[in-house]
Amino acid sequence: NWTSNQIEKANTAKDVAYLTTVEKECVMYINLCRLYPKDFLKYEVVNYYGTEKYGNYVKYSTYRQSLINLLNFMQPVDALYFDTEAYKNAKCFAIEPGKAGTTGHTRINCKDGNYAECCSYGMDTGKDIVLQLLIDHDVPSLGHRINCLNKAYTKIGVSVQNHVKWDTCAVLDMIW
């Protein structure tokens, strides 16, 4: 299990008063993976096959297996720290498709920015959001995984909002 020291190092957004518990969990779980890839594999990925809501949708996924292979050899990278501007961008874009019922990265009223963006739909916990992005099931580019684990990124903004079709929309914007 995670030590209190590991949780403390990973939980870089814990003192941001306006973030929800789920948003703080997103930052913490990405950081646990970045800081402690082999432990993350052991504690979070090896026995993760999906969610209660969607069943064991990744149990036999080659994408899950490729994440296992990566984490076995990945060197730790620095934690991400909360950034207000990235949060504002993420929040705007979590609300916009949530109301419209859309998915993807096309903005209508939210401004484009110079950041790496990950969008997750339908997940209820920070852990499930992060594992959806890291496993990147059926995303051949593995773009979400690459963004989340890229050592060039140092800052993150996360917003989780309601989505009319998928219940939730989480947007994570990372910058350097």
Regions found by a protein language model. Give the residues of each.
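A well-ordered secondary-structure block
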Residues: 88, 92-176
